Amino acid sequence: LLPAEQAVEFRGLSMGEKEVRMERAWRETDPSPETGENEVRLEFLKRVEIANARYTIFGPGMLSDRGRVYIRYGEPDETKVERLPVADKTLGYALGDQIPKSSRDALTKTETGAPDFRPYEIWTYNLRGREIGKHYGMSEINSGMKFVFVDDHGYGEYTLRYSSTSGMH
């Protein structure tokens, strides 16, 4: 949730320094400090719980690519999920003109030229998403954000392969 330069700095801190920094960050994000609850922190914890319930495969769901996007932006407005894509349900077909051709080709071209039948999810945020982490608070997100996750090996572990927004790779 931190900007890249702050994330690098944060990783270098001791455990005690990390705790102090996190507590200060939560105080700074509190939209209503006069109440006993920090609504941003509660929303963050709720999203972590949902990410762990939905996306845990080989490790905690909150650390997976889908979990990280979910925690940061919330529930997508639209999701297209294909667990067993066939014929006109392949990733290349589903993406159509939704992303730049060069990105689409990089995602869907196979070494053999055969159709790409990997399972995938496409998440689109139009209006509903609320980003946590933008300067330690919550903000409305840009409309039309798109994320493409692909299960490269068929084990249910989806990797973020395309993002229309900077900061999520």
Describe the residue ranges of each PLM region.
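Residues within mature, well-folded domains
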Residues: 1-169
